[in-house]
Regions:
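Internal alpha-helical transmembrane segments
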Residues: 2-78
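Cytosol/matrix-facing amphipathic helices and coiled-coil assembly/linker segments
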Residues: 2-27, 79-161
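Structural signature of hydrophobic alpha-helical transmembrane segments
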Residues: 181-193
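Helix-coil boundary and interhelical linker segments in multi-pass alpha-helical membrane proteins
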Residues: 43-58, 173-183, 230-237
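Core segments of transmembrane alpha-helices
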Residues: 35-40, 161-172
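Alpha-helical transmembrane segments of multipass membrane proteins
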Residues: 66, 70, 168, 172, ...
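Interfacial loop-to-transmembrane junctions
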Residues: 197-222
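Alpha-helical transmembrane segments and their lipid-water interface positions
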Residues: 38, 70-82, 134-138, 142, ...
Length: 237
């Protein structure tokens, strides 16, 4: 059986160094799915209402830019809140180590005990961890407060989600922008491939097969577009 990844020292080091990128990958996938779903839903709704291609482009572009910015701003605010909380708790733990070192060592003992360390091994681990204050505090933030082990970068997260939203959100509009006919049929095909592709990529971080993840994402996008199209038909002249 082929293992999912290698275990040479270089491969292990590279994999550990990449942990901080998982959040950006999540943001890119989330932004890509939402960008495609919302834009194609607008295309389907306007098409269902029987309105012109110009209105499709105008409303679609407005959604891509405005909703993309809104998502990026919301992501920035949420990520910044986590980063600010991490910095606040870092200062708290640093002060506690300075003013009540034994109490913090007792906390570290309990954390290590919950991980199964006992006796001499536990004492050696405590000694080594507490010798590096930054690593000690980082461990406490993760184990005591449940914060991620790496510091969040709000601006980078916002840029990633905005770029993914815009890039994926423009795809359903592409046939209208370059004059492909019939534009709506092309938009359906392009959006369907985008939904499936993003879902297939997402499967790398799930336990389900790539084709199933692709189909699930395709069905979600298709359902949203169908609802929008049905609402649009209600207002068809």
């Amino acid at each position: 059986m082929t293992l999912e990844h290698g275990h040479t020292p270089a491969e292990i080091a590279a994999r550990l160094d990449q942990q901080s990128g998982s959040g950006r990958l999540r943001d890119a996938i989330f932004g890509g799915i939402d960008g495609t779903v919302t834009t194609f839903a607008i295309v389907a709704g306007v098409q269902g209402a029987g309105l012109s291609a110009g209105i499709v482009v105008a409303l679609g572009m407005a959604n891509v830019l405005a909703d993309g910015f809104s998502m990026a701003a919301g992501n920035y605010a949420g990520t910044k809140a986590v980063a600010d909380d991490r910095r606040r708790l870092w200062d708290v733990e640093e002060r506690h180590i300075r003013e009540n070192r034994q109490g913090e060592l007792d906390e570290l003992d309990q954390i290590l005990a919950r991980k199964g360390l006992r006796g001499q091994v536990q004492r050696e681990a405590r000694k080594m961890i507490s010798a590096d204050k930054d690593q000690w505090i980082s461990l406490m933030l993760t184990e005591e407060y449940g914060l991620p082990p790496v510091d969040a970068r709000p601006i980078r997260a916002a840029i990633v989600i905005f770029a993914a939203f815009v890039a994926a959100g423009l795809l359903p509009l592409l046939p209208y922008l370059i004059g492909l006919a019939p534009a709506f049929s092309w938009s359906i095909a392009i959006s369907g491939l985008t939904f499936f592709g993003i879902g297939a990529i997402k499967s790398r971080w799930t336990l389900i097969p790539w084709w199933r993840s692709g189909i699930e994402t395709l069905l979600i996008g298709g359902l949203a577009a169908s609802l929008a199209f049905a609402v649009g038909r209600l207002f068809h002249p």
